[in-house]
Amino acid sequence: MIPQRGEVWMVDLGLAQKTRPALILSEPYSDKDRALITVISHTTKLRGSKFELPVSAPFLKPGAFVVQSVTTIPAKLALRRLGTLSNDYLRMIEDGVRRWLRL
């Protein structure tokens, strides 16, 4: 199963960031593309940053997506699908990424 844009998956981000929920931000890849996905990680340890965007969803613990954590990883590190964010939440996170990157 290829992770889809707007879905939240448990992903293995390695020893430093561990396994945690992450929002899939990239479009699905095709057979000719590299099997990579771009994700934004979710945290429950908030610091009060303007780049921590809180999201309420039944499949997530209280916390926020950290738009400073844009990361591209191999799709095989997406372990299991948790659910899909609403279009409103997805737009809010996209806007946060634009602010962070000044796009």
Model region roles, listed by residue range:
Residues 1-103:
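Conserved functional hotspots at enzyme active or ligand-binding sites that engage polyanionic ligands
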